[in-house]
Amino acid sequence: MSIVSQAEQILDRVRAAGAEGDLIIDQGEALSLKAKDGALEEHKVTSSQVFGLRVIKDNRVGTAYSEAADGESLVALVDQALLNASYAAVEAHEKILANALKLETQDAQLSPIDQATVAEKIELALTIEARLAAKPMVKNVPYNGVQDSVGERRVYSTTGLEARSKARMMHCYAYALIESGDKNAMEGIGQAARRFVELDPDRLVDQAYQNTFDILQGAAIPSGKYDVIFDEEILPSLFNVFSMMFSGKSAKDGVNPMRDKLGEEIADSKLTVRDLPLDTDGFGYALFDDEGTPAQALCLIKEGALSSLIHNSMTASYFNSASTGHGTRGPRSTLGVGLHQLEIDAGTADDAALHAGAYLVVTDLTGLHSGANPISGEFSFGASGYLC
């Protein structure tokens, strides 16, 4: 039975029970390779498929999932979701959207056919480990790998929605352990691309080694006030820690300190932050959210002022607003909200002004979650980088 036929079978049973619902079907395939001491340590091939159903009946929401796809299991999936709904509290704002759109991403762009052989990927894994291990003072390369993964998501609903997205990611990474006397350090870096040929092992090895060597030679700097520039790899992690400030769900739950600050200045007037889900250069690209709402660009902070929160259909209903296309839900999880991919507008300072005087380039932060309180905004992180 085809995926479409299975979805129809599930949703027909939901309708027959007098309920409405939506169904997420996730499928994935992955290849994972790791090297150790010049030999292949891991060659893992995995595949997965999971059905995740949400039903709403009498304003009560129930969810259930199944990794099995036989007819009996799919019947049980519907029955379990309906049973769970019968015990749930009433949620007046959570509905299945009246959305009959047909949405589909472009496979040729986001999930291109892989021209590289498994042998070539194995050779890449061995090459990365060998080249990094051969660098001066490198004791070993404890963490390294080459991965090729393809993920596909389909979303169907009782109102006629049919949405499909598919994406491929090639990923390689390496961490070096360097020892010199009684000092040691371990650092690394990774790369991601949609095509195997876009991976650059020479650059990966050189950067991983240089990062580790620099940390080995590093020392604490005197306490004081420093101008700070965040490395482009660490800045997204910092923003992610405080992403709750944009959440319509946390605002609904009463734990978002920005709930009543729309239109107010909350940051430097030079800062403009946007969520750009339709930028195909990023791996956060999304044509639609997990409710099937079309994704669109959204300005979150405009010249320092909070301009929008992100909403799914439930939080939008609660605030008498419209969904911004930021609904999140997995086959095993309930409805939430989440960002796609943030972009900061370019500033006006030129390089000369930006790098004038002493400044600290932060390349790593530790304690990002344990050291941060996204409600109060207080934080205390360990930081490392370069004093320039």
Give residue spans per PLM region.
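Dual-mode signal for accessory low-complexity, basic/Gly-rich regions
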Residues: 261-388
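Active-site bordering "gate/hinge" segments
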Residues: 1-296, 302-305
